[in-house]
């Protein structure tokens, strides 16, 4: 088997694993109360950092590039909104929307060389454009899917940190009631979709520092000259940025709460498991970036988890119901699948 064929096989296998884990990593938390999500976010990020430590030791501690931490900071900032997103529009729809905008941002920045990166070329650019365009179309379809969130599961959802400390100052006196719970149905849908779009754009920018370092490593006049071309060598720095940023946010939250944070011990182990799943999925994504290039991996890996998450939302959590919603989902999935295939074949 040729080296190119091996890279393609490795890249697509890594993509499949990443898709399944990204679409399922929030599921362990669904049955548990997470409150406002701040403490849970810190637990999840601690698990992420521990996985990075193990990977770093396996790779014999490659050189640490501090600039790669910026990508982790961007991811953690985007992750602030995840708990409100899940509370307002549900697990499946939330991942579908932010995944679509994640795909578009990551694809465009790699394809056109934004933020100082080198523009990436593909064998069949027309197919690549079609694939990215279909991701955008699917995102707009998802905006019209209505989700139903049971009151008793309003916060058990997901991973990350949540509303900012400014929001915490205006919370309802009820310790279990947050600003999200006071929104009307229409407001919840608008707020959830808007936050999902913003998070998706930030998620799509998370690999920019790493790709920037790799691109400039080929230039003798750059401070990054000679830097590794193996994406996994940047895992530890990237995940350290995530953990550092989440720690800063959590400490700011504790100050805002006057050293009385809302802790939910029963969610610690599920949160840790969620973090491990996310970290493994991201490692697979790094492998896919190396084997396929970001311009190919982004549309595939960011579109797929929405399908997995929505299946959880439909069959297990009953968040999405009704014939109209099912038809819209089927249409969106067909578009996603077509877009992913176009993107994949653009590399060959």
Swiss-Prot record:
Presence of keyword Ubl conjugation: no
A Pfam family per the record: TMEM144
GO cellular component, one term: membrane
UniProt-listed InterPro entries: Sugar_transport, TMEM144
GO molecular function: carbohydrate transmembrane transporter activity
Membrane-topology annotation of the record: Multi-pass membrane protein
Source domain of life: Eukaryota
Keywords: Membrane, Transmembrane, Transmembrane helix
Principal location listed in the UniProt entry: membrane
Transmembrane intervals: 8-28, 39-59, 64-86, 93-115, 125-145, 193-213, 235-255, 267-287, 295-315, 326-346
Compartment annotation: Membrane
Similarity remark: Belongs to the TMEM144 family.
PANTHER family reported in the protein's UniProt record: TRANSMEMBRANE PROTEIN 144 (PTHR16119:SF17)
Entry protein name: Transmembrane protein 144
Higher taxonomy: Eukaryota, Metazoa, Chordata, Craniata, Vertebrata
Gene coding for it: TMEM144
